[in-house]
């Protein structure tokens, strides 16, 4: 799925989950609308699966409904994406990321390319779990020297399924040797380290994407 294409705009890959646990409607809305002002956007999911939007509210339900009717509402297959064609990578808050993106070999390949080329990456909330797939052959994490944020344990334990989570981002980051920081639950908190922007939760989406746009603008 690609947004309306305009010439001379850099390309941004927006990676979302295709798992049943879904994609945060509000986070995706902000990611898509803000990034569309600066990029030609391509949305991709594992297997090209349709996105299941969660946390749909009265304020965003109409946008989600209209979005589904767009000609570009079918995601591309993540497996067929060539990361070299994109200038930026954006991952909204996706509870489903823990199920599919966090173990995606295709996304790992793209992230390794972005890391080696120091291309801008932005991951928000549960979408930060997607970064965990990017391990080297020696099982070290490509972001092990970075500072980042993501859902804190304090935020995650409030959900009934905490004990069944396949991955806890805060633990993974710390165990991998990277520096993890978090503010109080639900607070807006964004970390920028080199070319990597991370947001603690869906509430942090707007300032996180603003930082991505700043990073891309400073490279022109």
UniProtKB/Swiss-Prot annotation:
It is found in: Secreted; Early endosome. Residues 1-38 form the signal peptide. Keywords: Endosome, Glycoprotein, Secreted, Signal. Glycans are attached at residue 201. It comes from the Eukaryota. Coiled coil: none annotated. InterPro entries: Class_I_gatase-like (IPR029062), Prot/Nucl_acid_deglycase (IPR050325). One of its GO terms (biological process) is methylglyoxal catabolic process to D-lactate via S-lactoyl-glutathione. Its main location: secreted. GO terms for cellular component: cytoplasm; early endosome; extracellular exosome. Disulfide bonds: none annotated. Component of the FERRY complex (Five-subunit Endosomal Rab5 and RNA/ribosome intermediary). The FERRY complex directly interacts with mRNAs and RAB5A, and functions as a RAB5A effector involved in the localization and the distribution of specific mRNAs most likely by mediating their endosomal transport. The complex recruits mRNAs and ribosomes to early endosomes through direct mRNA-interaction. Homotetramer. Component of the FERRY complex composed of five subunits, TBCK, PPP1R21, FERRY3, CRYZL1 and GATD1 with a ratio of 1:2:1:2:4, respectively. Belongs to the peptidase C56 family. This is Glutamine amidotransferase-like class 1 domain-containing protein 1. The lineage of its organism: Eukaryota, Metazoa, Chordata, Craniata, Vertebrata.
């Amino acid at each position: 799925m690609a947004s309306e294409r305009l010439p001379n705009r850099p390309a941004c890959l927006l990676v979302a989950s295709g798992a049943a646990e879904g994609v945060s409607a509000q986070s995706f809305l902000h990611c898509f609308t803000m990034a569309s002002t600066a990029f030609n956007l391509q949305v991709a999911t594992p297997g090209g699966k349709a996105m299941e939007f969660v946390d749909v509210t009265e304020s965003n339900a109409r946008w989600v409904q209209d979005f589904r009717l767009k000609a570009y509402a079918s995601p591309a297959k993540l497996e067929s994406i060539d990361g070299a064609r994109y200038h930026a990578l954006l991952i909204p808050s996706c509870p489903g990321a823990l199920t599919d993106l966090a173990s995606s070999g295709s996304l790992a390949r793209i992230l390794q390319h972005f890391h080696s080329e120091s291309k801008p990456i932005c991951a928000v909330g549960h979408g930060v779990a997607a970064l965990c797939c990017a391990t080297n052959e020696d099982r070290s994490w490509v972001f092990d020297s970075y500072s980042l944020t993501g859902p804190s344990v304090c935020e995650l334990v409030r959900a009934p399924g905490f004990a069944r989570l396949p991955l806890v981002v805060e633990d993974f980051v710390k165990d991998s040797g990277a520096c993890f920081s978090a503010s109080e639950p639900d607070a807006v908190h964004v970390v920028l380290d080199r070319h990597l922007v991370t947001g603690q939760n869906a509430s942090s989406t707007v300032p996180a994407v603003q930082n991505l746009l700043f990073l891309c603008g400073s490279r022109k």
